[in-house]
Amino acid sequence: MNRPWSPDSWRALPIQQQPNYPDAAHLLKVEQTLASYPPLVFAGEARELRRQFAEVTEGRAFLLQGGDCAESFAEFSAAKIRDTFKVLLQMAIVMTFAAGCPVVKVGRMAGQFAKPRSSGDETIGDITLPAYRGDIVNGIGFDAKSRIPDPERLLQAYHQATASLNLLRAFAQGGFADLHQVHKWNLDFIANSALADKYHQLANRIDETLAFMRACGLDSAPQLRETSFFTAHEALLLNYEEAFVRQDSLTGDYYDCSAHMLWIGDRTRQLDGAHVEFLRGVHNPIGVKVGPSMNPEELIRLIDTLNPANDPGRLNLIVRMGASKVGDHLPGLIRTVVREGRKVLWSSDPMHGNTIKASSGYKTRDFAQILGEVKQFFQVHEAEGTYAGGIHIEMTGQNVTECIGGARPITEDGLSDRYHTHCDPRMNADQSLELAFLIAETLKQVRR
């Protein structure tokens, strides 16, 4: 692609999934205010994540990405951030030990406020209103006032993201991520799990390793008490994203400093569209959701547009096919990418292709289908001789009842007990950890 890029060049192209703000002058003022604020992350941090992505692409690390479907203003609290961060740490230690390689930890946090919708409107009875597009755009209440897009919400999202990042950095570097403590949390989980016998062997081996390190005097090393943690969200509201574009003083490259990583959704990946145009010019590591409608030729064009230098740390293909489709659609895409010599990080999003409506009316996901898609993702890569590099999940550290199934199964009738999501159903802490142990077993076999 030869046309020049600038932070606002996306504005000249067709754009999908954007709210209709009634007051353009108000929106412009808020955009200018955001642009004057300090960045949320720094270019050097995004460069470091890009380096770590390259390690994953080359098969020397594994990517764990998880967090909320859509962050909420009303439910924002230190406890919720802590609990999600804690579960991600617990998942990571299990995977690290089983795989024998570093696990790159990226949270869908501190910016995952906006959501694409299948329809621009929502109808209940004989009333039709604009769809809820996330707290950064409008309110979830089904009334005319709540559903009006409000630019002031962009500012509130920034301030919440700032507070979230401040807390996450403190957790990552302040001792909360101590390996011994994280392992103790996992032991507590195992003790109360229906699959305790299955997990004890791995837990005992981790115990022995930590005891050996303690005996060698290695238990006080900073690497055991601190961790690297990065943030990511879907780059959906481009006026918000543009406000955080900064030119790096060291390299001259542009970075979107709203998060370390950004991704393009399956609904906004048009080659001639604004979202691809915006992300092709920022030097963050980026992702693209790859659904069953993606064909091999389109995928190669997207890869070449977003990663023309074929840098192994630049592009994450996040596969979200559904358990019933991934086995049919993924092999052809992998073969084309390999044949064309493109370097990409393949990860599995087993959530978005497996959403169903329960008989009770709740939107849900079946844990068996989630696990089924992950297993097929690994099987396809093994058959093709390529590396299954990561997992991308919607989860929470809270004890919600939004996805059915699991070792302590949630039934369709039980969904209403603690169904709190503002958008799509999330795995709870127990389901997330169960998935981590099951992935760990697969990683152990793959990396022998």
Walk through the language-model features, giving the residues of each.
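N-terminal basic/disordered segments at the start of proteins
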Residues: 1-62
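Short, compositionally biased low-complexity segments
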Residues: 18-21, 53-66, 123-141
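Glycine-rich, charged/polar anion/phosphate-binding loops
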Residues: 48-50, 272-275, 302, 331-333
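Short acidic (Asp/Glu) and glycine-rich catalytic loops that position anionic groups and cofactors
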Residues: 62-68, 280-282, 311-313, 352-357
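Short loop/turn segments at strand-loop or loop-helix junctions that form parts
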Residues: 64-69, 106-109, 348-351, 394-396
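Active-site-facing alpha/beta catalytic cores
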Residues: 71, 76-322, 365, 390-392, ...
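An internal, amphipathic alpha-helical element
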Residues: 173-178, 344, 348-352
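Non-transmembrane, aqueous-exposed alpha-helical and coiled segments at domain scale
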Residues: 299-308, 314-345, 352-404
